[in-house]
């Protein structure tokens, strides 16, 4: 059973710079069954979703950092690193970002994009080959995220 659906995005926010993020949302296949179990125990799903997203984001951010070290991790990238925080959008939606934020350091977020996707050949600096360090880190943590989410839900639903 997959508990959370995650997807990777590079966003340009008008006037607010670039954000390299992993977005995660709670998506359960047996959602009705889970809700019924939690309702019987008078459990609220909001704290469960927050905990699942936070722990998933922490695992993912750690993997991104480890992968970035191997692929030319710069001081600017360290300064632009996002500290994962779960935000509640509405009653049923939560968001937790990981990656690099240009609001903290624009050069760091841009460096992360260039190291991940590469650049075309340039006269001054040559071509930067794509490493896909961000994308690989997200894919490599998929099973860990699923396992921790499953563990959290099963603990609460017992």
Tell me the role of every PLM-derived stretch:
Residues 2-96, 117-158:
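Short, Lys/Arg-rich flexible segments
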Residues 106-121:
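Extended Gly/Ser/Thr-rich low-complexity repeat segments
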Residues 93-105:
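Short, hydrophobic/proline-enriched secondary-structure or compact coil segments at domain edges
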């Amino acid at each position: 059973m997959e508990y959370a659906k995650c997807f990777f995005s590079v966003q340009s926010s008008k006037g607010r710079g670039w954000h390299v993020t992993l977005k995660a949302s709670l998506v359960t296949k047996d959602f009705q069954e889970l809700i019924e179990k939690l309702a019987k125990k008078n459990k609220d799903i909001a704290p469960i979703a927050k905990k699942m997203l936070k722990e998933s984001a922490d695992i993912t951010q750690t993997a991104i950092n480890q992968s970035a070290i191997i692929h030319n991790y710069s001081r600017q990238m360290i300064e632009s690193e996002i500290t994962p925080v779960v935000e509640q959008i509405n009653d049923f939606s939560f968001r937790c970002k990981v990656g690099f934020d240009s609001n903290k350091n624009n050069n760091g977020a841009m460096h992360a994009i260039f190291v991940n996707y590469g650049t075309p050949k340039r006269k001054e600096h040559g071509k930067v080959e794509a490493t896909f360090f961000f994308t690989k880190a997200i894919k490599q943590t998929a099973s860990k995220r699923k396992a921790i989410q499953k563990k959290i839900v099963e603990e609460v639903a017992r």
